[in-house]
């Protein structure tokens, strides 16, 4: 008796065969540099499979199976949707419906991601007239199998109904709306290769518009038509090829449709292109820079092409032109137009003049397609001789010194690559991503954001945003000095070494070449060198210490330098990420500014006089609150000088009013209120001190989703802790007034318990932190006076991190005197002042540092 092996069902066999054929194609693609052959091969294989299913389902020859969308173009990425149209004759038997459903179901069973529609010719035309998306997908329709006559009749009706002008307007509006979803920038941390500005969809949109207008359906045809030049066509093909290849590789790596270049895939995608990490740049950073350059070129060329197509579709009536620069520029319909195509070749100094005129001429809203094209094709003119030309250096300084339009001018100079060709070191940081968990913009975009922020300080309409900064810049002479410092403060990022020192050398050279001399040049160079200093002092040092203020004042040296550094620092922090700036950081910086200004004005940083002033101000506030005279003494007699120096008069008055009747309280007193300095909750805790108190409070905040921004810990002479916290709720939109009572009750109840400290929860890291973890660092050392120990911690941010640190300190009976919690996007750089008599023992120090590193490890 012979054994027999059962044949697999036909559906399973078909699926296995198709899957094997597709796998073979993808395997070949892994070693190929170009994706177009793969896309065409996948499309052909899908055509063959669908034809086979069509015939198997016995669908009649009177119907037609039509590929639409990207499948219609004959281009399929590895896991793209397969969009098909089953085209029906006007009169058809109803029993066909069952066979069509079977066909579509079998296509799904084959493993195809089918997007299907079943319509007559009339229904297609009707649907397309109401929906530009349908109209677009039908534009590239291609017959796979079935009635040729029906398909040709459909295409004839479609072309007759297509209004090229209306289609142009609809697609341009659609593109603008799509760009708005991505904040109108290609420089996203995780760009969508297909949909983001400068992505594949922009290129497809141009070809759709051109095809609808009858101008051609390829870059070669648009070149022949005169809409683009040979050089532009080559650039478009090159960048289109890169974007298509990148998208296909994302699909292969992810094993599914994946158009977003997420952090998790950036390294693998980079390696698939052959990028290798260097000491200065990760492989992923090199890939992202290539992507941003491609997206930038696509954006620039798309602008030119769309304007050119618009000019063909909507010929302008001969409007009035205004001469702006004889023989060089005119204004035409609100756009800056070159007087002749070879203006930049004949007059290279006109290149920067174009941006000066755009910036300074009212009524000019942009550069015309003709001007943009001339700039794009004049890159060879922008050489060393052009950079050294004194006329260009004067014009560049004029652009910086205009009363308005500076931000727009510099953005346009960057978009057209002129800025990077004039400042070669700027070109090196265009499209350079910073995977420091802090900046969310590329270096060039961050620099321009900082420039924009400084400009906004000086614009009256934005004075309400940062009133103090606006007040300072009004009286700041020659504010263009700040703009130069902004341009150079991060220009040396990614070179290796200290970017502040390298940038300082670049800034000094720029000043020398552009006639910036004396105090102005010295200020620019000094600002670039010290652009991080004020932030570090305000957020990491004890600014209640007169010695800290005196040392910072000595570094600054003058009110002009202090004001310049303050304005640059605020603009810099605000230009890193929408999440990094908060009102608490603003208060720290403003307090440091005012304290330093007083010292520069001749005031001596004397602790005794400062203490007396704050006490007098606090007493005045208490009188307004009708607190009895001398009622404060019971509490104040238990407080040391440090308490009065670390708190302002308003906080001292509030805490005194709450506590003066309860100086010897038996139970914990907890009071909370919306923070006077911004969107946060201020929490006061007064209770008999114990070694695990700080950790216990942090445990409560952690369990309730409250992040600590600042902690000021005080111990009274009679053994009570008087601790003050500033906390925020970042996960949910919350009204702090509404949760104040709940925090008071819950935290007081938690402190009344004698339960041991809970195990810290290792909160989930963000995808960015998981992909680009930083090496945790712990540094523990005695301060200059030997009074406290300073603990500095740097790590990936995650829920529960502060409590993990506090618990280790509590286990070793190390008291926390003060804490500065500095969250920078996805990373933290926290500083603690510790009371730890035992820390003088080196073995204990090493043990604490080791356990802290273990606690903060990812």
Swiss-Prot record:
Keyword S-adenosyl-L-methionine listed: no
Residue segments, region Uridylyl-removing: 325-681
Keyword Hydrolase: yes
Gene3D superfamilies assigned to the protein according to its UniProt record, in alphabetical order: 3.30.70.260, Beta Polymerase, domain 2, Hypothetical protein af1432, Nucleotidyltransferases domain 2
Alphabetic keyword roster: Hydrolase, Magnesium, Multifunctional enzyme, Nucleotidyltransferase, Repeat, Transferase
EC number: 2.7.7.59, 3.1.4.-
Uridylyltransferase as annotated region, ranges: 1-324
Domain (HD) ranges: 443-565
GO BP: regulation of nitrogen utilization
One Pfam family from the record: HD
Disulphides: none
Signal sequence bounds: none
Single GO MF descriptor: phosphoric diester hydrolase activity
HAMAP family documented for this protein: PII_uridylyl_transf
Role played: Modifies, by uridylylation and deuridylylation, the PII regulatory proteins (GlnB and homologs), in response to the nitrogen status of the cell that GlnD senses through the glutamine level. Under low glutamine levels, catalyzes the conversion of the PII proteins and UTP to PII-UMP and PPi, while under higher glutamine levels, GlnD hydrolyzes PII-UMP to PII and UMP (deuridylylation). Thus, controls uridylylation state and activity of the PII proteins, and plays an important role in the regulation of nitrogen assimilation and metabolism.
Family to which this protein belongs: Belongs to the GlnD family.
Protein name: Bifunctional uridylyltransferase/uridylyl-removing enzyme
Organism for this UniProt entry: Burkholderia pseudomallei (strain K96243)
């Amino acid at each position: 008796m012979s054994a027999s092996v059962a044949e697999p069902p036909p559906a399973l066999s078909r699926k296995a065969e198709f899957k094997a054929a597709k796998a073979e194609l993808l395997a070949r693609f892994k070693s190929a540099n170009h994706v177009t052959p793969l896309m065409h091969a996948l499309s052909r294989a899908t055509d063959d499979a669908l034809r086979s299913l069509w015939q198997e389902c016995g669908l009649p020859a009177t119907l037609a199976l039509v590929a639409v969308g990207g499948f219609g173009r004959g281009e399929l990425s590895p896991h793209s949707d397969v969009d098909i149209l089953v085209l029906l004759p006007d009169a058809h038997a109803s029993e066909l419906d069952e066979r069509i459903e079977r066909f579509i179901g079998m296509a799904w069973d084959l493993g195809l991601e089918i997007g299907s529609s079943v319509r007559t010719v009339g229904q297609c035309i009707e649907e397309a007239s109401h929906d530009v998306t349908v109209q677009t997908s039908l534009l590239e329709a291609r017959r796979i199998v079935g009635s040729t006559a029906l398909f040709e009749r459909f295409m004839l009706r479609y072309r007759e109904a297509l209004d090229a002008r209306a289609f142009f307007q609809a697609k341009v509006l659609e593109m603008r709306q799509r760009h708005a979803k991505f904040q109108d920038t290609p420089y996203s941390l995780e760009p969508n290769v297909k949909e983001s500005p400068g992505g594949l969809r922009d290129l497809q949109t141009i070809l759709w518009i051109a095809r609808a207008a009858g101008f051609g359906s390829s870059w070669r045809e648009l070149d022949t038509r005169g809409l683009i030049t040979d050089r532009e066509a080559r650039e478009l093909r090159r960048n289109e090829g890169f974007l298509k290849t990148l998208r296909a590789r994302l699909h292969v790596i992810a094993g599914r449709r994946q158009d977003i270049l997420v952090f998790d895939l950036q390294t693998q995608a980079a390696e698939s292109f052959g990028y290798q990490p260097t000491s200065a740049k990760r492989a992923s950073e090199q890939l992202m820079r290539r992507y941003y350059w491609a997206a930038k070129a696509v954006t620039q060329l798309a602008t030119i092409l769309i304007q050119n197509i618009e000019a063909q579709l909507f010929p302008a009536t001969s409007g009035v032109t205004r001469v702006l620069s004889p023989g060089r520029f005119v204004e035409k319909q609100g756009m800056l137009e070159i007087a002749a195509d070879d203006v930049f070749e004949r007059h290279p100094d006109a290149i920067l003049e174009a941006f000066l005129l755009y910036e300074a001429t009212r009524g000019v809203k942009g550069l015309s397609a003709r001007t943009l094209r001339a700039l794009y094709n004049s890159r060879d003119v922008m050489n060393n001789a052009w950079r050294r030309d004194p006329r260009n250096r004067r014009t560049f300084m004029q652009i910086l010194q205009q009363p308005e339009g500076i931000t727009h001018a510099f953005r346009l100079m960057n978009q057209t690559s002129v800025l990077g060709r004039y400042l070669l070191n700027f070109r090196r940081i265009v499209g350079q991503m910073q995977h420091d968990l802090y900046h969310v913009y590329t270096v060039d975009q961050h620099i321009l954001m900082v420039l924009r922020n400084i400009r906004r300080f000086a614009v009256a309409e934005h004075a309400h945003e940062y009133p103090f900064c606006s007040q300072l810049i009004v009286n700041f002479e020659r504010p263009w000095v700040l703009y130069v410092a902004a341009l150079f403060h991060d220009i040396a990022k990614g070179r290796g070494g200290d970017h502040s020192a390298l940038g300082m050398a670049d800034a000094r050279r720029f000043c020398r070449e552009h006639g910036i001399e004396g105090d102005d040049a010295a200020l620019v160079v000094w600002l670039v060198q010290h652009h991080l200093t004020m932030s570090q002092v305000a957020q990491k040092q004890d600014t209640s210490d007169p010695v800290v203020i005196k040392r910072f004042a000595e570094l600054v040296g003058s009110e002009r330098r202090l004001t310049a550094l303050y304005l640059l620092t605020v603009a810099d922090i605000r230009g890193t990420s929408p999440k990094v700036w908060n009102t608490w950081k603003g208060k720290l910086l403003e307090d440091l500014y005012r304290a330093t200004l007083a010292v520069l004005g001749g005031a001596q940083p004397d602790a005794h006089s400062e203490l007396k002033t704050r006490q007098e101000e606090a007493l005045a506030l208490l009188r307004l609150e009708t607190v009895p005279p001398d009622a404060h003494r019971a509490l104040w007699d238990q407080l040391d000088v440090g308490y009065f120096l670390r708190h302002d008069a308003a906080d001292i008055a509030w805490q005194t009013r709450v506590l003066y009747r309860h100086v010897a309280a038996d139970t914990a007193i907890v009071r909370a209120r919306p923070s006077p300095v911004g969107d946060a909750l201020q929490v006061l805790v007064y209770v008999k001190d114990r070694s695990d108190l700080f950790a216990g409070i942090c445990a409560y905040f952690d369990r309730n989703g409250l992040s600590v921004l600042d902690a000021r810990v005080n111990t009274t002479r009679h053994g009570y802790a008087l601790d003050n916290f500033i906390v925020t709720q970042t996960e949910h939109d919350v009204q702090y007034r509404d949760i104040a009572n709940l925090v008071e009750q819950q935290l007081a109840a938690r402190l009344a318990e004698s339960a041991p400290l809970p195990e810290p929860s290792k909160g989930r890291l963000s995808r960015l932190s998981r992909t680009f973890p930083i090496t945790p660092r712990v540094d523990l050392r005695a301060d200059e006076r030997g009074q406290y120990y300073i603990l500095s911690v740097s790590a990936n941010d995650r829920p529960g991190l502060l409590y993990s640190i506090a618990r280790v300190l509590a286990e070793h009976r190390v008291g926390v005197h003060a804490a500065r919690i500095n969250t920078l996007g996805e990373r933290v750089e926290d500083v603690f002042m510790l009371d730890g008599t035992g820390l003088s023992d080196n073995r204990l120090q090493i043990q604490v540092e080791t356990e802290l590193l273990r606690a903060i490890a990812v």
